[in-house]
C-alpha cells in the first residue's frame, strides 16, 4: 500500500513557510509531504478571495498526489472542511489548534459560541478588505514559546489576510474519513475552550502543552502525534 502524502495547510496570515521545521522533521523520517500557499494570504491577494478559493487550491494540490492526509492549522482547519469532499484519495484529516466550522458557518462564526477573547483578537487590525496583525501582540499570540529568533523571523513572513475568507460560510458536507484534533493548551490565539468544542467534532483528539504554533516550538512532538494519528 502506498504511503500517504501529508498535505500541510497553513492558517491565517501565513504561508507554506509555517511548515519549515515540521517539514524538516517529516523529511528526516522519510515521510512524503507538501505544503499549500492559500490564495487568501498571498502577497497581492485579491480582496474577494473566499474560503472556497482556498479550498480549491488545497484540492488541486492534494489530487496531484496519491493517497493523502490533510493537515490544517488554525484557519486552515476551515479550509480542510471545505476542501475534503473534493479530495479524491483522502485518508484522514488532522486539525492543529484549528477551526472546524459546521456546514453554513464561517471561520469567524465557528468561535462565537464560546465568548473567549484572546491576544490574537487584540492584535488584529482592519486595513480595508484585509486584516493585518500588530507585531508585538502577534508575537505573543502566535509564537510566545517558539524562541525569539524563530518568532522574529516568522513575524517578517506574515501577510494580510482577506476578510472575505474568514467570513464566507462552509458549503461542503462532512466526508467519511476519520479526523484527529491536536489541542494546544497554552494557545494565545485560539482559546482552549474553543479548541475543546472543535475537538468534539472530530473522531479523536490529543493534547500538546504548546502555544499556537507547535510546528515551530515542538516539531518532533507534533510530528509524533500526526504520524500516530494514521
Residue ranges and their predicted role:
Residues 21, 82-83:
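Active-site signature of alpha/beta-hydrolase-fold catalytic machinery across serine-
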Residues 127-173:
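Conserved alpha/beta-hydrolase catalytic His-Asp/Glu region
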Residues 35-69, 85, 108-112:
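Active-site loop/oxyanion-hole signature of alpha/beta-hydrolase fold enzymes
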Residues 71-76, 80:
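Gly/Ala-rich beta-loop-alpha elbow adjacent to hydrolase catalytic centers
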Residues 159-224:
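Conserved serine/cysteine hydrolase catalytic core
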Residues 3-43, 89:
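Conserved HGGG/HGGXW glycine-rich cap/lid loop of the alpha/beta-hydrolase fold
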Residues 85-90, 94-132, 162-166, 190-191, ...:
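Flexible "cap/lid" loop of the alpha/beta hydrolase fold
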Amino acid at each position: 500500500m502506498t504511503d500517504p502524502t501529508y498535505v500541510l495547510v497553513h492558517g491565517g496570515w501565513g504561508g507554506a513557510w509555517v511548515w519549515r521545521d515540521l517539514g524538516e522533521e517529516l523529511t528526516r523520517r522519510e515521510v512524503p509531504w507538501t505544503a499549500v500557499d492559500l490564495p487568501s494570504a498571498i502577497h497581492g491577494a485579491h480582496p474577494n478571495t473566499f474560503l472556497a478559493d482556498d479550498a480549491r487550491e488545497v484540492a488541486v494540490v492534494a489530487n496531484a498526489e496519491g493517497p493523502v492526509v490533510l493537515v490544517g492549522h488554525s484557519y486552515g482547519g476551515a479550509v480542510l472542511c471545505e476542501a475534503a469532499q473534493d479530495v479524491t484519495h483522502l485518508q484522514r484529516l488532522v486539525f492543529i489548534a484549528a477551526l472546524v466550522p459546521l456546514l453554513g458557518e464561517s471561520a469567524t462564526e465557528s468561535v462565537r459560541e464560546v465568548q473567549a477573547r484572546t491576544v490574537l483578537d487584540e492584535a488584529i487590525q482592519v486595513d480595508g478588505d484585509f486584516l493585518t496583525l500588530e507585531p508585538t501582540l502577534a508575537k505573543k499570540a502566535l509564537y510566545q514559546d517558539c524562541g525569539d529568533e524563530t518568532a522574529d523571523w516568522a513575524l517578517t513572513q506574515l501577510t494580510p489576510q482577506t476578510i472575505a475568507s474568514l467570513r464566507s460560510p462552509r458549503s461542503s458536507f462532512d466526508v467519511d474519513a476519520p479526523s484527529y484534533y491536536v489541542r494546544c493548551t497554552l494557545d494565545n490565539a485560539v482559546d482552549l475552550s474553543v479548541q475543546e468544542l472543535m475537538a468534539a467534532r472530530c473522531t479523536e483528539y490529543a493534547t500538546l502543552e504548546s502555544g499556537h504554533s507547535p510546528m515551530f516550538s515542538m516539531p518532533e512532538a507534533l510530528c509524533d502525534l500526526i504520524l500516530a494519528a494514521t
